[in-house]
Amino acid sequence: MSERLLVLVRHGQSEWNLKNLFTGWKDPDLTAQGVSEAKDAGRKLKAHGLSFDVAFTSELTRAQHTLKLILDELGQPGLPTSKNLALNERDYGDLSGLNKDDARAKWGEEQVHVWRRSYDVPPPGGESLKDTLARALPYYVQEILPGVLNGQRTLVAAHGNSLRALIMVLEKLTPEGILKRELATGVPIIYRLKADSTVESKLDLAG
């Protein structure tokens, strides 16, 4: 029986993560630490004896760069890769590019907290987590999952909120449950799935 392997990894630290800015669909690259995190992710996957048949990523540089560095570490630089905006980070709209402390000063700490941590309240001109899930989930179900179930060993390098969409369906989490889930930068999560697409095992390679 072929292995139903799905590995998710959030991009390494970006320049705007470091500066405490809302990033969303803005396109900063990785910091030196982010590069190191991505390479380390590749080394960890290699140490677990993993290789892949296909990869998916977003249309944003920080996720694509993370994927490239991981594949280089695995010795798979030419792996077939699909890039799609469905896997892009949540669009923070008018908050994009703002320092998080400055945003709190402008709109108030409580309002910014609602935009960041509620499930269905978007910031001005942006997306809620629910909106992000509405584009990421169909892409997962239609484009990623069928290959996994057919034995394609699959790697997804994306963003905290788009990966939350995949984790929500994989782990059958409620909106409240997924809001509490924090994803560290550059840390692979290894899922092995059953034939019915539910999770057989999960291994988080943190540390």
Curated annotation (Swiss-Prot):
GO biological-process terms attached to the record: gluconeogenesis; glycolytic process
InterPro entries on file: His_Pase_superF_clade-1, His_PPase_superfam, PG/BPGM_mutase_AS, Phosphogly_mut1
Keyword terms: Gluconeogenesis, Glycolysis, Isomerase
Job of this protein: Catalyzes the interconversion of 2-phosphoglycerate and 3-phosphoglycerate.
Assembly mode: Homodimer.
Entry annotation: catalytic residues: 11 (tele-phosphohistidine intermediate), 89 (proton donor/acceptor)
Organism: Bradyrhizobium sp. (strain ORS 278)
Family designation: Belongs to the phosphoglycerate mutase family. BPG-dependent PGAM subfamily.
Protein name per the record: 2,3-bisphosphoglycerate-dependent phosphoglycerate mutase
Catalytic activity, as annotated: (2R)-2-phosphoglycerate = (2R)-3-phosphoglycerate
The protein's annotated pathway: Carbohydrate degradation; glycolysis; pyruvate from D-glyceraldehyde 3-phosphate: step 3/5
PANTHER family, per the entry: PHOSPHOGLYCERATE MUTASE
EC number from the UniProt entry: 5.4.2.11
Chain residues that bind substrate: 10-17, 23-24, 62, 89-92, 100, 116-117, 160-161
GO MF assignments: phosphoglycerate mutase activity
Listed CDD domains: HP_PGM_like
Annotated site (Transition state stabilizer): 159
